Amino acid sequence: MDDIDAMFSDMLQEMDLLTQSLDAEVDSAPLAKPPTIPEPQEMNFSIGFANFNESLNDLEDNDLDALMADLVADISATEEKFATERDTSKGSVPVAPAPSKPQSNFSLPASFDSSKPATSSNSIAAPPPPPAFKPSKEEEEEQLKADKIKLALEKLKEAKVKKLVVKVEITDGSSKTLMVDERQTVRDVMDNLFEKTHCDCNVDWSVCETNPDLQTERAFEDHENLVEPLSTWTRDTENKVLFQEKKHKYEVFKNPQIFYLWKKDKKSLKDMKEKDKEQLLEENFCGASVIVPDLEGVLYLKEDGKKSWKQRYFLLRASGLYYSPKGKTKASRDLVCLVQFDNVNVYYCKEYRIKYKAPTDHCFMLKHPQIQKESQYIKFMCCDDEWSMNLWVTGIRVAKYGKQLYDNYKAAVRKASGSASWANRTIQASSTASTPSPTPKAKAANGHAPQPPVENKVPSNQSSLPPPPPSMDFLPPPPPDPMFPPPPPAPPAPPAPPVPVSSTKVNKFPPPPKFPQSSFPPPPMDDLPPPPPPPEIADLPPDFLPPPPPSFVSHGGESLPPPPPDPVASLPPPPPAFTSAGGAPPPPPPPPPPPAPAPAVNNPAGSVRKVAPPPPKRTTPQLAAPSGGDFMSELMNAMQKKRTQP
C-alpha cells in the first residue's frame, strides 16, 4: 500500500509541475482541461482511494497479488492507449502544415476526390513538414506535456473507480478471493468464478448475500453491480457472499404456468407442453410491457415493533404490494399500499418461527438494501407453505425488474449451452482417443502367452519320452533291479525296490547324453571302464541297435548281454577300439537282436564291439562307479546263466 500511495502522490506532484510550466500561448484545446478539471479530479481520486483502503481493511483474507495484478494491468492498458494516440497524433500533425503553404495547389485535388488527392498530397507534402516541425521544439514539448496530462487524468479516472476485494464462499467449503470494481456486473463475476472453480455453467448458479443479524438471504440479479450493494455493508458486518445453486432463481421461465396459471390444478400444470410454455412467455414478457403474475391471497403480516402477526389479504401489482384491511375486497379504493418496489429488495428469511414467533418458517421480507439491522421500515410476511412463498417472491421480482429478468435468463442459457457443447466435445475427443487401444492388446497378450510355452514343452517331453516306453516294456524281466537304481544320478535312486519308478527315471537321464551316439548301452559301459572285472564289455554288438540298448539299460539284466564280451583287453586302448568296432558288425549276426535279445546273447563272444566312445562322454554316471563293479559281476553271472539255458 505504501508503494501505491507513493505512486499516486508522485503523479499528483508531476501534474502540478506540468500545469505550472504551461505557458499562456499554448493552444486552448489542450490547456482548457487542466484548469477546470484538476481540483475535482483530485478530490474524486482521494475519495476513491479512501474507499479502496477501506475495502482492503474490511476484509481479512484479501488477495494482494490479485489486487496488484489488476492495478498494473489497468495502468499498462492506459499507458499503451495513450502511447498509440500519441503516435497517431504525431503522424497526423505533419499533414496539416503541408496544405497551409501550397494552398492553391492542393485545394483543387481535395475537392475532386477525397481518397486519391490524399495520397498524392501526402507523397508531395512529405518533404516540407520535417523542416517546419523539427525546429519547433517548444511545440513538441507542449505536446508531450499535454499527453502526460491526459495520461494522468486517465489514471485518476481509473483510481476513482470503486474496487473491492471480495471473498466468495462456495458450497464445497472452499473460497475464492476476487477484486471487483463498480463496472462489473454479477454476470461478469459469475463468469470469473466459473473459470476459477471449473463448475458447470448452468442457469441456477447465483451469487448470494447472507445477513446473520437479520437471518436473511438474497440472490443478486445478474445485471446488478456487485460493488453497489456490498458498499452498503458496515465495517463490522458479518455478512457473507456465497456462490451456490438456486433452483427457484429462473423457475418462472422454466415453468411459467406455475406463476401465471397458479389458480388451476397443480397436476395439470406439470403436464404442460413446451410449446404452450413458450407461448405463455411470449405473451407475458415479449410485449410492450411485462405482465406481472396476478397473485392474491392471505398472508401473515408482522406488526411494527411487535412479535404478533395478523392475516391480511394481499394483492400483487406492478407498482407494489397492496393489502385489503376489509376482508377480501379488491376495490382499488379499499386497497392499502404496503410497499413499492422501486427502492426495496425481497429477501428470504430463516428460522423466524423461533426469532419472531412466526406462524410458519416460510417467511420473506421487503427492505431497503442499506438497512442492515432491525428497523421499523422492514416489512415481514409469512406464508403457509414453501410453494406459496416462492410464488410471491418470484412475482415481486418480476414486478420490480420486468423484462430485464428475462434478458438475464436468456444470457445465462447462452452461457450454459456454450460451455456444455464445449465440454461434450472435449469428453468425446478424449474418450474416442483413449478407450479402444488397451483391451485388444491385453487380450492378445493373455491369449498368446500360455500357448507358446505349452507347445515348447510338449515337443521337448516327446523327444525324451520315446526311449522310456520300450524300457517300460522290459522292466519286469530284470532280476538285478535293486542294484541298478544306484547308477542313475536322478532323485529316484534312493527308492531302489520299486523297479518301475527307477526304470522310468533312469531312462530320462540316459537319453540326453546318448543323443550323439543314439545307443543307450554305452552308459553302463561308462561304468564298466573303471571296474577291472568286466571282461565281457567287449561284447557290445547288441548295443548297435538304438531301441534295444535303452531297454537293456533300464532292465539291467538284458543290457548285460552286450557288456559280457570277453575282450576286456580292448578297454585300455579305446581309440583303436573305435575302428575295430566299426568293422566288427559284419562277423556277428546282429540283425536278429532287434526283435529279441536272445540272438544278441549268442553272438557276444564272437563279435567284439568296442563301444569305447560312449564311456569318455559319459562322465555323470561316475558317481555309481564303485558299485558298478559288483553290479557288473552279477550281471555277467546272470548272462552266463541265460547262455547256458537253451
Swiss-Prot record:
SUPFAM superfamilies: PH domain-like, Ubiquitin-like
Bilayer topology annotation: Peripheral membrane protein
Transmembrane segments: none
Domain Ras-associating span(s) in chain numbering: 162-248
GO CC terms, sorted: cytoskeleton; cytosol; plasma membrane
Primary residence: membrane
Compartment(s) of residence: Cell membrane; Cytoplasm, Cytoskeleton
Pro residues composition-biased segments: 465-500, 509-536, 560-577, 584-598
Top-level taxon: Eukaryota
Stretches the record annotates as Disordered: 82-141, 420-646
GO biological process entries: signal transduction
Keywords: Cell membrane, Cytoplasm, Cytoskeleton, Membrane
Family assignment from sequence similarity: Belongs to the MRL family.
Name under which the protein is recorded: Amyloid beta A4 precursor protein-binding family B member 1-interacting protein
The gene coding this protein: apbb1ip
